């Protein structure tokens, strides 16, 4: 959530920055905001006047009583002021709630270094990497896609449809082993080499957790709501609503909700391997073949909670942590700086890592690393105690390290051999019993 003080100080500048984001989108109901702000200022001024008058009269009451004089008239006026103050306080509370409702629908302000653009065509390539130089080396034979390569190895889309519907996949045998090996390898890299603490988290979270990281209320349609037994047809109170996690960013970042962290404990680095559940609303007809876009997929998530002065240094660092996995696996990729029109709701700046897929002859997203600055922390009331002893909002960052399913797709396509078999990347062989070919 944006700092309301920033909007009060320079609304025009904030609106100009917001308008560089994806359109059409109602970022802020400006007229409603200005009307509420005007009423708030008037009420606050009146409230301060009433409080000052009440204090003066209360002093008079004490003086009159000390002299043995009648104070009934003055006390009656104090009583009248009390009622007006209570009414003002109630209306101020209502205004603050209405302002909050407006602000939770507003995305983060793009950082000044973010390229301006209306959609993904405005994204800027930062660098690319390949084991053979910058560009991927041709396979030397016609590339099969991951579906044709994976089905003989245990990738079963028909069973996924039978069990759950479209955009679900079953993995068996060699493919299941490869999937598990990838997740374990990613966790080992992030915990042993990059200092993240491995966490096991619930796959079901409450509405407060999703509000804290920004998925609610704006993106409820992208979530899977969970119902307890016997809840069918019964209204569920907001504070009892439960959802399947769309990413472990949600539980990990919420570790610091309503907390004041000692500055000496920053940065906090957390990682978790979890399934992620997304309805993929608005993605109908896109990536219908294979594993690229699923309702359920696994991801190793990285989260950092940092000092505000060091969050952009942490963004570069985390991007490198995701790149390290791709480099160890020998997978060609490029790093893209997302433009203002392609960034996520809570991000101030985002890098996407895109892996090379030979069968598609293109790069596809495999990781997204974002600095949310204080946007989530303000919702979460996640703070640290600074050197002066004052509480200050932390900055939060999150990123994939990596999406396991898409990494599996990339391994199948980049390590395919002319006979249709798939070689095992050297880094994964210890996790697969030393096998050099997936079998």
From Swiss-Prot:
Keywords: Aminoacyl-tRNA synthetase, ATP-binding, Cytoplasm, Ligase, Nucleotide-binding, Protein biosynthesis. L-serine binds at residues 247-249, 301, 400. It catalyses: tRNA(Ser) + L-serine + ATP = L-seryl-tRNA(Ser) + AMP + diphosphate + H(+); tRNA(Sec) + L-serine + ATP = L-seryl-tRNA(Sec) + AMP + diphosphate + H(+). Pfam families: Seryl_tRNA_N, tRNA-synt_2b. Gene3D superfamilies: Bira Bifunctional Protein, Domain 2, Serine-tRNA synthetase, tRNA binding domain. GO terms for cellular component: cytoplasm. It comes from the Bacteria. It is found in: Cytoplasm. InterPro entries: aa-tRNA-synt_IIb, aa-tRNA-synth_II, aa-tRNA-synth_II/BPL/LPL, Ser-tRNA-ligase_type_1, Ser-tRNA-synth_1_N, SerRS_1_N_sf, SerRS_core, tRNA-bd_arm. Its EC number is 6.1.1.11. One of its GO terms (biological process) is selenocysteine biosynthetic process. Its main location: cytoplasm. GO terms for molecular function: ATP binding; serine-tRNA ligase activity. Pathway: Aminoacyl-tRNA biosynthesis; selenocysteinyl-tRNA(Sec) biosynthesis; L-seryl-tRNA(Sec) from L-serine and tRNA(Sec): step 1/1. ATP binds at residues 278-280, 365-368. Belongs to the class-II aminoacyl-tRNA synthetase family. Type-1 seryl-tRNA synthetase subfamily. HAMAP family: Ser_tRNA_synth_type1 (MF_00176). Consists of two distinct domains, a catalytic core and a N-terminal extension that is involved in tRNA binding. Homodimer. The tRNA molecule binds across the dimer. Catalyzes the attachment of serine to tRNA(Ser). Is also able to aminoacylate tRNA(Sec) with serine, to form the misacylated tRNA L-seryl-tRNA(Sec), which will be further converted into selenocysteinyl-tRNA(Sec). This is Serine--tRNA ligase. It comes from Paracidovorax citrulli (strain AAC00-1). The lineage of its organism: Bacteria, Pseudomonadati, Pseudomonadota, Betaproteobacteria, Burkholderiales. The gene is serS.
């Amino acid at each position: 959530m944006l700092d309301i003080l920033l909007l009060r100080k320079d609304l025009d500048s904030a609106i100009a920055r917001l308008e560089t984001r994806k359109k059409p989108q109602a970022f802020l109901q400006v007229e409603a905001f200005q009307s509420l702000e005007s009423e708030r200022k008037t009420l606050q001024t009146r409230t301060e006047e009433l409080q000052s008058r009440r204090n003066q009269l209360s002093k008079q009451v004490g003086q009159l009583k000390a002299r043995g004089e009648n104070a009934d008239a003055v006390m009656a006026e104090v009583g009248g002021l009390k009622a007006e103050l209570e009414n003002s306080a109630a209306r101020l509370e209502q205004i603050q709630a209405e302002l909050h409702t407006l602000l939770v629908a507003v995305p983060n302000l793009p950082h000044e270094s973010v390229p301006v653009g209306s959609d993904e065509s405005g994204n800027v390539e930062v660098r690319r990497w390949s084991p053979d130089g910058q560009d991927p080396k041709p396979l030397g034979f016609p590339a099969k896609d991951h579906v044709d390569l994976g089905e003989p190895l245990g990738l079963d889309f028909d069973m996924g449809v039978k069990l759950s519907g479209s955009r679900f996949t079953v993995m068996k045998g060699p493919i299941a082993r490869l999937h598990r090996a990838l997740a374990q390898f990613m966790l080992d890299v992030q915990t042993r080499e990059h200092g993240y603490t491995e966490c096991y988290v619930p796959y079901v979270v409450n509405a407060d957790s999703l509000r804290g990281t920004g998925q609610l209320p704006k993106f409820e349609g992208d979530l899977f709501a969970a119902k307890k037994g016997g809840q069918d047809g019964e209204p569920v109170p907001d504070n009892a609503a439960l959802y399947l996690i769309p990413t472990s960013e949600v539980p990990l970042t919420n570790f610091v909700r309503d907390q004041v962290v000692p500055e000496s404990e920053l940065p906090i680095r957390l990682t978790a391997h979890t399934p992620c559940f997304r309805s993929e609303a608005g993605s109908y007809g896109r990536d219908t073949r294979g594993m690229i876009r699923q309702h359920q997929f696994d991801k190793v998530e990285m989260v950092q909670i940092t000092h505000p002065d060091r969050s952009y240094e942490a963004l570069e660092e985390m991007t490198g942590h995701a790149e390290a996995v791709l480099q160890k696996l020998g997978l060609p990729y490029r790093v893209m700086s997302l433009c203002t029109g392609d960034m996520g709701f809570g991000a101030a700046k985002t890098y996407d890592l895109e892996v090379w897929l030979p069968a598609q002859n293109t790069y596809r997203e495999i990781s997204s690393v974002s600095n949310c600055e204080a946007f989530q922390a303000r919702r979460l009331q996640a703070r640290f105690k600074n050197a002066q002893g004052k509480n200050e909002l932390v900055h939060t960052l999150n990123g994939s390290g990596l999406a396991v399913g898409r990494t599996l797709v990339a391994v199948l396509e980049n390590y395919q051999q002319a006979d249709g078999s798939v070689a095992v990347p050297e880094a994964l062989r210890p996790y697969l019993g030393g096998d050099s070919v997936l079998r």
